[in-house]
A protein has these predicted regions:
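N-terminal, charge-rich interaction modules
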Residues: 1-35
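FMN-binding flavodoxin-like domain, especially the glycine-rich phosphate-binding loop
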Residues: 5-9, 60-135
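Metal/cofactor-centered catalytic core regions of large enzymes
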Residues: 97-437
């Protein structure tokens, strides 16, 4: 069968990949975002490949099947460090992160050229709720009393408005656990009135974040302060990258990610900071001052950068003699709102780079191993724990965009103290995606 010119054209397009992150996935999103020939998309309906990375236990399989069946044909699934569904015949599995980009590119090319058959659907072709022949008019609705018209729940104005007294219909839905704007694993039941978050209830907490190996090593023996601080700065840059993606600033997001990939003790964040300030991000995209604010008790529970953004000068590095030799003093904001937490990332990145340069010059290692200040918060007698229960208090009353950017500024996942091997790619697949830093 002849291959049409349209198929040949599609075969050479970047591989459109929707990433479903399971437990212990690691920074695969950041890795693939700079890989040449890969395009990460925000919806499974825009993808030709579903990439599942990390452990997805049985309790999440139904959610993953729903994502799987949303991809338009022809499509395929690729499993990385994850067990494929038993119902799949000859699933593609790639556990080597370095081989993942080329494997995705080859899969897309085979699909588009007709060399690989499209994957089969896993779920029956049925509406989410039965509706045919139900209700007064046979479409599932119950007049003005709700029901499920054509299988979809009808919005109802059953709750008072939180903002201006205008009672709009309330739409309740469930989001997660594989939505790219949420921490991996987080699932919530949300009620919206217009674009206002009326309620937010966490139904499943996020998967625990995986600790970088250098922080685990620091709990066992003295390690280079420069290595710790460069890793801390890179972590904050990755958080900033994800936040910029959610805010809809892809060019600055990609620039931030490339800066993180090239990060070294001589790196200077001044140019990136200047671009962020001049772009109008704080004025045009981030919530207004006071929005997403945490009180002192919430800030202490969150710990780490979120606490320091609320004016709490708590940082375990202050208790390390060699950090004190470097003149370390916590950098803090005072407002404790969403914008303050974004500023805190930038200030801590700049501080970490300065500490790394000084530590290299003095050849300093950590003096304490009984505790460590991780990028997620303090790790002393226990790891940072899950704090997603705070979201039910913090997010209601915010507009949808404000809520997503507030959530992006909060590190609510617990910490998994067992590190992964390095998941960053070599330069082979980063070629062709360079931008100015």
């Amino acid at each position: 069968m002849a291959v049409s010119w349209l198929r040949r054209l599609a075969a050479h397009a970047p591989a459109a990949v929707f990433l479903a992150e399971g437990a212990r996935a690691g920074p695969v999103r950041e890795t693939l975002a700079v890989a040449h020939g890969i395009q990460l998309v925000d919806s499974p309906r825009h993808a030709s490949i579903l990439l599942i990375v990390g452990n997805v236990s049985n309790g999440w399989h139904d959610d993953l099947r729903r994502v799987y069946d949303q991809l338009p044909a022809p499509f395929a699934s690729v499993w990385c460090r994850s067990e494929p569904f038993e119902a799949l015949s000859n699933p593609t599995r790639i556990d080597d992160i370095a081989a993942l980009p080329q494997g995705l590119i080859d899969t897309q090319r085979e699909l588009m050229l007709g060399q690989r058959a499209s994957a089969l659907r896993l779920l029956p072709d049925e509406p989410p709720n039965p509706w045919e022949g139900l209700g007064d008019d046979g479409h599932g609705g119950e007049g003005m009393m709700g029901g499920n018209p054509y299988g979809r729940p009808m919005a109802m104005n059953m709750q008072d408005d939180l903002r201006d007294g205008l009672t709009l219909d309330t739409l309740t839905f469930r989001l997660g656990p594989f939505h790219p704007a949420l921490p991996p694993g987080l699932q919530a039941e949300i009620s919206l009135q217009g674009d206002l978050v009326q309620s937010w209830s966490v139904t499943r907490p996020p998967f625990a974040s995986v600790i970088d190996p250098v922080f685990l090593a620091a709990r066992q023996a003295p390690v280079s302060i420069a290595a710790l601080e460069l890793t801390r700065a890179r972590h904050h840059l990755h958080r900033l990258y994800r936040g910029l993606c959610i805010a809809g600033w892809p060019t600055l997001a990609e620039r931030t990610l490339h800066f993180a990939g090239k990060l070294g003790p001589d790196s200077d964040i001044a140019g990136l900071r200047r671009s962020l300030e001049r772009s109008g991000l704080w004025r045009l995209a981030l919530p207004a001052p006071g929005r997403g604010e945490v009180d002192k008790a919430q800030a202490r529970e969150l710990g780490g950068p979120a606490a320091r953004a609320a004016g709490i000068e708590e940082d375990l590095r202050c208790q390390d003699a060699n950090y004190r030799r470097l003149g370390f003093v916590p950098t803090c904001q005072q407002a404790g709102d969403t914008a303050a937490r974004w500023w805190q990332w930038l200030n801590e990145i700049e501080q970490s780079l300065s500490l790394a340069r000084q530590a290299i010059r003095l050849d300093l290692k950590t003096a304490e191993s009984a505790f460590i200040e991780t990028p997620h918060g303090p790790w002393d007698s226990s790891c940072p724990h899950d704090k997603s229960d705070l979201l039910s208090d913090l997010l209601p009353g915010l507009e949808w965009g404000e809520a997503m950017l507030t959530l992006a500024s909060l590190d609510v996942a617990g910490l998994d103290p067992h590190p992964l091997e390095d998941t960053r790619l070599t330069s082979t697949f980063q070629a062709g995606r360079e931008v100015g830093t």
